[in-house]
């Protein structure tokens, strides 16, 4: 494939302005894709769609641009700029080609990328929880981070994990509160507990959940 990419780059220059230039550019993108050089492949496919928006391979180029960006996304713990770019490209593909045979695959990739973004938020919330009261009220930051993730991605596969983290953080906030805030925070924790139990009645976490009722 490396040799093919070299030859195709030369051909594109020679064939510029001819009917064969379009096909050669798409083939170049596939050559990079098959080499697993996903960043260059995506750039090449995007160049194709910009140059030949109604071209023979426009739909496939748009799809493969999104898939290449999808395959090039970083681990959840790293910066997720590439993940947002991949989502944007896949959503562009879905917008332009709503009847495509690749529609379901593209949607599945979008959902997987969104879950990666949620996982990063979950990892951040969990870190805040583990920091506890070190240099401030990290439990509150945990709650805010987890709640924002649920607001942005309400159907995420991490919904239960984020919800239990919120409940546990609220419990710790109640335990560590000053006396005048303790009763209200315990009540919030109890409300959170029942909300969790109602939404996840079969949760694996329920057997180990305990809360302390506020003193009268």
Model-predicted regions and their roles:
Residues 13-21, 49-58, 77, 91-108, ...:
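Short solvent-exposed coil/turn linkers within tandem alpha-helical repeat scaffolds
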Residues 211-216:
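Conserved small/polar residues in nucleotide/adenosyl-binding loops
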């Amino acid at each position: 494939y490396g040799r093919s990419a070299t030859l195709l780059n030369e051909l594109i220059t020679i064939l510029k302005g001819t009917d064969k230039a379009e096909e050669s550019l798409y083939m170049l993108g596939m050559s990079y894709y098959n080499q697993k050089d996903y960043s260059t492949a995506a750039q090449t496919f995007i160049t194709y769609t910009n140059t030949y928006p109604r071209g023979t391979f426009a739909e496939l180029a748009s799809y493969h641009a999104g898939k290449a960006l999808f395959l090039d996304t970083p681990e959840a713990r790293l910066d997720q700029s590439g993940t947002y770019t991949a989502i944007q490209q896949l959503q562009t593909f879905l917008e332009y080609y709503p009847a495509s045979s690749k529609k379901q695959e593209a949607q599945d990739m979008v959902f997987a990328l969104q879950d990666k973004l949620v996982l990063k938020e979950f990892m951040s919330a969990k870190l805040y929880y583990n920091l506890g009261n070190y240099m401030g009220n990290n439990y509150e930051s945990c709650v805010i981070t987890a709640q924002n993730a649920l607001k942005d991605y309400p159907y995420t596969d991490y919904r239960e994990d984020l919800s239990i983290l919120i409940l546990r953080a609220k419990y710790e906030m109640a335990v560590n509160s000053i006396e005048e805030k303790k009763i209200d925070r315990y009540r919030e924790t109890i409300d959170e507990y029942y909300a969790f139990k109602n939404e996840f009645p079969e949760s694996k976490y329920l057997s180990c959940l305990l809360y302390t009722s506020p003193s009268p």
